[in-house]
Amino acid sequence: MGNPQTTIAYSLHHPRASLTSALPDAAQVVHVFESGTRAVLTRGRARQDRLPRGGVVIQHTPIGLLVIIDCRAEFCAYRFIGRASTQRLERWWDAHMYAYPFDSWVSSSHGESVRSATAGILTVVWTPDTIYITATIYGTAPEAARGCDNAPLDVRPTTPPAPVSPTAGEFPANTTDLLVEVLREIQISPTLDDADPTPGT
């Protein structure tokens, strides 16, 4: 697939299961977490934000794998669309680790909604005190993708790449949210014709 173009990584600390934690045997998993972080890396830029207490939903559906992170003020929902409607998270049985390759994905946050015909892989790692959810998105659509007639996504920053702090790992609080910026760039990308309009427009 080549080098990843965008990585979105969540670390959710001190999770407590509201329903079930057996991903392969359940259609839905609901957890509450006490705190967390969200990191976004794209084309030389990086940002990490702290997340307050919130909830996470991971759900198998006929239209893909849903991941919802809801911290009230911070909200983002993702739908990762696999190559078959029966595709499930694949588990490496010697570890609490799951993988879900996808051919396209949909994401919605506060004020932004977008669909992208680009492939990648979602991984979910469970530890006793943290859930790690990472979406690695590549800049070219797979040759075997079906139902996607659009050109590959090429996410380009509208401003020169900013250097990543080697110590803090976070940008100032007043910096524009990089995830929202990435979603907005995908939405207005002239190479992607099927971007969803912003809700309410």
UniProtKB/Swiss-Prot annotation:
The keyword Transmembrane helix does not apply. Pfam families: Herpes_UL4. GO terms for cellular component: host cell nucleus. Belongs to the alphaherpesvirinae HHV-1 UL4 family. Keywords: Host nucleus. This is Nuclear protein UL4. The keyword Ribonucleoprotein does not apply. It is found in: Host nucleus.
